[in-house]
C-alpha cells in the first residue's frame, strides 16, 4: 500500500511540473504577441502601418 501511494505521489508531482512548464510557455507566448515590432525611420512601409511613427504614403517610408 505504501509503494502504491508513493508511485501516485510521484506521478502527481511530475504532472504538476509539466503543467507549470506549459503555463510558463503560454505566458511567454502572450508576452511576445503583445510586444509590437515597428519599422524605424526610412524603412519601407505599406498598407499596414508598421512604422514606429508615421508612414509617408507618397514615399512609402517611415518618417
Swiss-Prot record:
Cystine bridges: 38-52, 45-55, 51-62
GO cellular component term, pick one: extracellular region
Pfam families: Conotoxin
GO molecular function ontology, one term from the record: toxin activity
InterPro entries in alphabetical order: Conotoxin
Subcellular location: Secreted
Signal peptide, first to last residue: 1-13
Propeptide section residues: 14-37
Domain notes: The presence of a 'disulfide through disulfide knot' structurally defines this protein as a knottin. The cysteine framework is VI/VII (C-C-CC-C-C).
Family per similarity comment: Belongs to the conotoxin O1 superfamily.
Protein name from the UniProt record: Conotoxin Bu9
Organism of this sequence: Conus bullatus
Amino acid at each position: 500500500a505504501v509503494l502504491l501511494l508513493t508511485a501516485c505521489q510521484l506521478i502527481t508531482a511530475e504532472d504538476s511540473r509539466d503543467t507549470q512548464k506549459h503555463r510558463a510557455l503560454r505566458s511567454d507566448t502572450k508576452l511576445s504577441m503583445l510586444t509590437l515590432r515597428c519599422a524605424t525611420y526610412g524603412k519601407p512601409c505599406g498598407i499596414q502601418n508598421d512604422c514606429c511613427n508615421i508612414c509617408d504614403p507618397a514615399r512609402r517610408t517611415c518618417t
